[in-house]
Amino acid sequence: MSRHGDAQVDALQHVEDPINDYIAQHIDPEDDYLYRLYRATNIHTIHGRMASGHIQGRLLKMLVTMIQPRNVLEVGTFSGYSALCLAEGLPPEGKLYTFEINDEMEDFTRPWIAQSAVADKIVF
């Protein structure tokens, strides 16, 4: 089980626990910064369940790592969890362009992106 415990909500929530356990055992552990962002999203936002979460985030990073695009467009940044994961997989010269229409979410997200290890790859 992940660090999120019973409160974890992700796209695979409806899948049987053995499958989630298998996936969790075979993917990279969740980065501490992403974990803190996920927690802050669920504590400080109304729609925290919309955050991508660990499993989805690792999938996004894997896809970008395999494809190696120079540019990625994300429409709907929300708290920035998926943006950080996408940016992790980009090549050194890669850029992620992400847009958020909700001003309150942008205010929440901007510091998280700015303080991240991949801030130089994200245009927000």
Protein language model features and the residues they cover:
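A short alpha-helical cap/connector motif
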Residues: 1-124
